[in-house]
């Protein structure tokens, strides 16, 4: 399990629609170059590079350097940790709402 700071960084990275779309584009498992991603998102190279750096710093993607080409691949383990955190808290809130609903039913005249 990742630290709280690492999860914070993950959720900050995922807060941006373009970065979530990049994660989706990489979800197929194939490594993609920054240029390929830039063409897909119709963004300038510096913008794409900044988004990729945020994702890389959050450990959501990893970089593979092949000469001058930098390819990026999704790191599924980081997404799994974030998903596990969400599921744990979802279970808590679902249980709390169910308990509240039961209490309210018991209080009805």
Name each model-derived stretch:
Residues 1-6, 27-28, 80-109:
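Amphipathic alpha-helical dimerization/coiled-coil segments
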Residues 2-46, 69-80, 84:
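N-terminal helix-turn-helix DNA-binding core of bacterial DNA-binding proteins
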Residues 24, 56, 62, 94, ...:
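A cross-family signal for key residues in well-ordered alpha-helices
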Residues 38-39, 50, 56-57:
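Alpha-helical residues within the helix-turn-helix
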Residues 57-67, 73:
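Beta-hairpin "wing" of winged helix-turn-helix
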